[in-house]
Amino acid sequence: MSKICQITGKKAMVGNNVSHSKRRTKRVFDVNLFRKKFYWVEQDCWVVLRISAAGLRLINKIGLDAAIKRAAEKGFLNA
């Protein structure tokens, strides 16, 4: 499984570590991902999603059904 949020589509970014002497080396900024189990009332089933902290806030704000529909329209859900 790749490190992509299934709700927001967030994925890892690439940047630089900058030392005191300003020498730059490449690094990866990973997304704050975790697996979370939700009860989907409209479908009467449990859903396990791999979401970021921002995705969890979005679900709390607009609801699970609306968030899943939005993610499906944008193509973030693979199932």
UniProtKB/Swiss-Prot annotation:
HAMAP family, per database record: Ribosomal_bL28 (MF_00373)
GO molecular function per UniProt: structural constituent of ribosome
Top-level taxon of the source organism: Bacteria
Keyword Repressor among record annotations: no
Annotated protein name in UniProt: Large ribosomal subunit protein bL28
Pfam families: Ribosomal_L28 (PF00830)
InterPro entries linked: Ribosomal_bL28, Ribosomal_bL28/bL31-like_sf, Ribosomal_bL28_bact-type, Ribosomal_bL28_sf
Similarity comment text for this entry: Belongs to the bacterial ribosomal protein bL28 family.
SUPFAM superfamilies per UniProt: L28p-like (SSF143800)
An example Gene Ontology biological process: translation
Alphabetic keyword roster: Ribonucleoprotein, Ribosomal protein
GO cellular component terms, semicolon-separated: ribonucleoprotein complex; ribosome
Cysteines engaged in disulfide bonds, as pairs: none
